[in-house]
Amino acid sequence: MWDLIIDQTQLLKLKEFGIFNTKTNLNGVIRDHIYSRRNGFDQGVFPEILRHPANCQILHCKENASKRSSSWISIEDLFFKIKNYSGLWVEQELVLDKISQYEQGKRWTNEYRTNN
C-alpha cells in the first residue's frame, strides 16, 4: 500500500521519518484510515470502500494515537474522493459499485459477529 501514495507531502513525510516500528523506529509514520474503520463498520460501509487508497493517509504514530477511532472526513466526502481518484487501483470499479449499493441503502453486515 505504501506504493499507492500519490500525495507529494505524504511521500516526503514517509521519506523523512520512515515506517513506524516498535523496535527500530518509534518516530516513524503509519498508514491511517481517514474515515475510520470503526465508524465504517458501525455504519455498514463495505470493507472494499474503507481500504481504498483515497481513504488512507500517512500520520506520525503520535498523531494516530490522538486521533483514535475518529474520522477526519464524512462518508460523502470519502465517496467524492474515491469517485475522483486519479491513481490506479485494481478494485476501483468494484468500489464504485459498492458506493452505488451503499447510496441505494444496502449495508455491509458481519456474518460472523455473534449477538450474545
Segments and roles (model prediction):
Residues I19-N27, S74-N116:
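Extended charged
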Residues L14-K15, V45, I73-I75:
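N-terminal functional modules and adjacent low-complexity/disordered segments of proteins
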Residues R51-K83:
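Short Cys/His-centered divalent metal-binding micro-motifs
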Residues M1, I34, H60:
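Extended interaction regions within the primary functional domain
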Residues F20-C56, S69:
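Histidine-centered nuclease catalytic patch
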Residues L11-K13, S36, E63, K67:
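Intrinsic structural disorder/low-complexity segments
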